Amino acid sequence: TVSPLTIGELWALAIHLRILLIENAARIAVRTVVSRQARVEADALAEGLASGKTRFDDVERIMSHFAEHAKLSFMVQLMRRMRSLRDVDASTVTQLHHIMHAIGHDGEGAAHEEHGRQVANNLTMQNIFTSLKRIGEKDWEEWFEHVSLVDQTLSESESYRGLDGASRTTYRRTIEDLARHSN
């Protein structure tokens, strides 16, 4: 059965929206930081491989420490850096392609996928902040009075409409308490 939201549930809606948006922003921020760390490690590894200070076996060992989404960031950055270095032989790039295929990606498609994910995360964060701003600007009391069935019924009385906000809230809470105890 479908029942109308209680007064408390209606008031909690704005808070829950904020919480959900902030949790989503936090999730994206963590993923972004981890991906950034993966790219930094890829840069360091590329320098080490180019100078001979690092062995190729270290690629998979380092990559194994990252979450799945960061492995792609790591490999895309590593391949980009290795291609830009002059003294890297073709066999190293070929080995990187094999590792890329092992994690389920190809070189060019992976770069597009990584870029697309970064763009999507940026747009999502922008939308989250825009939504939080709009939620903050919303007149929640006006919205509440518009959607609350209790308030709509009480508003039929001219004397109720003439009350201040605190008095109207007291009326609504009293009615909800009565309803809760009548069940």
Predicted regions and their residues:
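Active-site acidic catalytic loop and adjacent metal/ATP-binding pocket
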Residues: T1
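Short, conserved sequence motifs enriched in acidic/basic residues, glycine, and aromatics
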Residues: P4-L5, G162
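Helix-rich C-terminal or lid/interface subdomains of diverse kinases
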Residues: L5-T54
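Basic, amphipathic N-terminal segments
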Residues: D43-S182
